[in-house]
């Protein structure tokens, strides 16, 4: 095999392996901690947690929203569980975010788009050399 082809193949495999992992802000669970400064890379099968919506019964019913601070296992996503506080039971809906750094109020999608553009440019420059002999 040509060395250029092997390089492209290895780069593609590395990009695919790392490209599936997302980053999330790790707030540490503390309201005073700065989420913008602590970034964690979520492992495969561990998407970013989303908002937990807790609907409390009453007149009128109340919905509490809680944002989880870090990556979670995929089986915890999109779940509805029953939680109890004293004599009151209520449903808790847990969803997960999809996308890089999306557990923030301002999601960042520039990095993945930039990586794709750079990869497309590199392939455009390198592929003609493979067929030129």
Swiss-Prot record:
Chain residues in the propeptide: 105-133
Coiled coil regions in record: none
A molecular-function term among this protein's GO annotations: acetylcholine receptor inhibitor activity
Signal peptide: 1-19
Lipid-modified sites (GPI-anchor amidated serine): 104
One GO CC term on file: external side of plasma membrane
Subunit structure: Homodimer.
Protein known as: Lymphocyte antigen 6 complex locus protein G6d
Organism (species): Homo sapiens
Gene name tied to this protein: LY6G6D
């Amino acid at each position: 095999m040509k060395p250029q082809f092997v390089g492209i193949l290895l780069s593609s495999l590395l990009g695919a392996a790392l490209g599936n992992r997302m980053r999330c802000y790790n707030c540490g669970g503390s309201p005073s901690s700065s989420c913008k400064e602590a970034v964690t890379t979520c492992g495969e099968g561990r998407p970013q947690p989303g908002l937990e919506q807790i609907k409390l019964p009453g007149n009128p019913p109340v919905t509490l929203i809680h944002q989880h601070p870090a990556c979670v296992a995929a089986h915890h996503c999109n779940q509805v569980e029953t939680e109890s506080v004293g004599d009151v039971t209520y449903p808790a809906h847990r969803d997960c975010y999809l996308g890089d750094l999306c557990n923030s109020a301002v999601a960042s999608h520039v990095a993945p788009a930039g990586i794709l553009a750079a990869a497309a440019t590199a392939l455009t420059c390198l592929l003609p050399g493979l067929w030129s002999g």
